[in-house]
Amino acid sequence: MIFYLHGFDATSPGNHEKMRQLQFIDPDVRLVSYSTLHPKHDMQHLLKEVAKQMKHSDDPAPLMVGVGLGAYWAERIGFLNGLKSVLINPNLHPEENMQGKIDRPEEYADIANKCVSQFREKNTHKAMCIFSVNDEMFDNQQLASELSAYYSIDWDDVQPHKFPQLAAHLPKIKAFKLA
């Protein structure tokens, strides 16, 4: 089972396409949608929804996959549920870069402060990151340097921020899920 978490643009048609591509790894791909506008509510909703979905699966190794803001959540919700995560062009600092886009971006800082201290150290090797070299939204070199001590980093020379084509990375994602 793969949980797919969309980015800030929840209605993008690319979400369906990415889910279809992920079905080459596992036919059971589930969209876990969230508002993107209310971080504290989103966290509660995502924790509840993932726990509910996991009760109805016998997959020994479910995987979280998120793009952009979805990768922010995939890392945290995956950690809290003991799941591996794939973080694609993750938005690591929504409290800074979501100003003016959502009602309460400061809630992300509050979530970070209340999260398990040093959670990345406790989550080492349980996530892999895929970064676009040409991401038009974030400085992925900086973000990769924040995560490289904890997770493997793969680079893509072609895809933009929304990462519409996962095909080149599906074998690595599958191997990571099954390892």
Curated annotation (Swiss-Prot):
Matching PANTHER family: ESTERASE YQIA-RELATED, UPF0227 PROTEIN YCFP
Source taxon at top rank: Bacteria
Protein source organism: Shewanella baltica (strain OS155 / ATCC BAA-1091)
InterPro entries registered for this protein in UniProt: AB_hydrolase_fold (IPR029058), UPF0227 (IPR022987), UPF0227/Esterase_YqiA (IPR008886)
Family indicated by similarity: Belongs to the UPF0227 family.
Name recorded for this polypeptide: UPF0227 protein Sbal_2415
